[in-house]
Amino acid sequence: MSDRYIDFANSSIGHRLVGALGLPSPVRLERWQAGRLRPVEGALLIGGGPLAARVSAFANRLTDGIYRYGEQPAAASEWIPGHGPKLKAVVFDASELQHTDQLKQLREFFQPLMKNLEHSAHLVILGRAPESLSDPFASSAQRALEGFSRSLAKELRSGGTLQLIYVGDGAEDQLEGPLRFFLSPKSAFVSGQVIRLTACATPVTDWTRPLAGRKALVTGAARGIGASIAETLARDGADVILLDVPPAKTDLDALAARLGGRSITLDICAEDAGAQLIEQLPDGLDILVHNAGITRDKTLANMTPEFWDAVLAVNLNAPQVLTKALLDSGTLHDNARVILLASISGIAGNRGQTNYAASKAGLIGLAQAWAPTLLERGISINAVAPGFIETQMTAHIPFGLREAGRRMSSLGQGGLPQDVAEAVAWLAQPGTGAFTGQALRVCGQSVLGA
């Protein structure tokens, strides 16, 4: 539904009034549009340590306007504060900051940029995982990056975002995929996140259609976020298979026909659901997206056994059982991608949602637990945790709660189903095997669970 407050805050009268009263002033976020060719449309600034040179090697595939601030990379044009162009994207390599005294480089690099960023600018800091370092001082310095990045993300204005990527040993050559996502409008509603990359050798041959030839199954696909995920996967070249309950067959069939895919109606909680699904997937799967989910909200004092059991069965048990069946049967191919739709409620909790929050936290735990084993087959498994997303469900939330949900993030607004779909589509790419066992929040840096 339309966010009328954003419309008002960005009108000439509303902008002045909001500023005078000190109210939140969210802006319309720039999102990926059909026909766009490059991740960054504007100036990209690269600086910092040796990983900056790695980024420089493929930066011309991200944008034409490449600038440097500091010594790295020498091939780029020098950016001069106050004289260079406004910046659309920034990458800073902080991986060699190994002592408290060196942390001042963060202030020295970023302070001059703060008033020179374009609308919806995207910033990324590169580091090394603190737990991988033997020197306590170096580990402390790298851990400090998290506090800095999350705080700076909250200071960005005009729809800006910032992420911290910890680059593991052997993952230095895996940066293009993550930067294509996090420096582009595809990550418009992702901010303040800490990402860990491990070594991965699966390449992407076509960045315009990275999912070409891959078969993708999306559950709960008839409408809402599930439908948006199916549309986005199809846009990126996947052969989509849409699954939902029998009562949703009409909408499901129509969407499948529009996307050139096919539909499956199935009760995923049925005792033989796994066997039925395997039978309908003779060619196997490369991408599995567990989006199907329900809510049955009550405080625990008033929670009925039926409400509890239904939510846990659909949201958690079904993904567990179906994924295991697809793995054991070989239906899920090697180098496949499994994405579980969790929720910010599974991280922060939510009053009246003990059943729902438990189910979504369980999905995050499932991704963490299964990741090491599945990595042996080249399979990655991750959770996506949406925050407040504008859907039919949130449209029925009482006005006061809905407005609070929208404003309680650094970006000051709710996300769109497209935002969740873009995150899923990125995680579905062959080249994202370096990212596994993690939960990616799509929440605009919500204050909940921060």
Outline where the language-model segments fall.
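A conserved structural motif in NAD(P)-dependent oxidoreductases
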Residues: 169-175, 409-420, 431
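Active-site helix of classical SDR
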Residues: 141-145, 323, 359-362, 367
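Catalytic Tyr-X3-Lys loop
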Residues: 81-120, 124, 137-138, 294, ...
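Short C-terminal tail/terminal secondary-structure segment
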Residues: 191-212, 436-450
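Residue(s) in the substrate-gating loop at a strand-loop-helix junction
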Residues: 343
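Conserved glycine-rich Rossmann-like NAD(P)H-binding loop of the short-chain dehydrogenase/reductase
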Residues: 63-72, 238-253
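Short, small/polar-rich loop/turn modules that mediate ligand/substrate recognition or access, typified
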Residues: 158-161, 189-192, 335, 375, ...
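Alpha-helical segment proximal to the catalytic Tyr-Lys
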Residues: 154-155, 328, 372-373, 433
